[in-house]
Design a protein with these regions (language model features):
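Bacterial N-terminal signal peptides
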Residues: 1-9
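Central antiparallel beta-sheet cores of small beta-barrel/beta-sandwich binding domains
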Residues: 15-116
Length: 117
């Protein structure tokens, strides 16, 4: 009697490690901007904070493979402005697009300054 062993095929998508302290630079329609970002990662979920001259703001996001999405909200003339960063991680860099609510979008480059311990 011939027995067949069936092993289910499981595709495992490894998530890039994006935890650490980042310097993010944007080129958007209103000019150039820069923020410092601390990202904590648990599986595919991201949390942390964004710091710029206007203050400190909580962030949330996800990572899938080498695709990263980070979102935070800042007060802009009394109304909240949601900023979304979509990019691909390449080693110690993230390159992609920043979307500033309905104001516009532009390119971004982020560089990891240090990793979380």
């Amino acid at each position: 009697m011939l027995a067949l062993l069936l092993v289910p095929s499981v595709s495992v998508l490894a998530h890039a490690d994006v935890s650490g302290n980042w310097r993010v630079e944007f080129t958007v329609p209103s000019g150039e901007m820069a923020v410092n970002m601390t990202i904590n990662q648990k599986g595919d979920a991201l949390s942390g904070r964004v710091v710029n001259e206007d203050g400190e703001f909580p962030l949330k996001g996800t990572v899938s493979g080498d695709d990263v999405t980070v979102v935070w909200t800042v007060p802009e003339r009394g109304a909240p402005l949601e900023i979304t960063m979509n990019g691909k991680i390449e080693g110690e860099y993230i390159n992609g697009i920043a979307r500033l609510g309905n104001v516009g979008e532009g390119s971004l480059t982020a560089r990891r300054m240090s990793r979380n311990p």
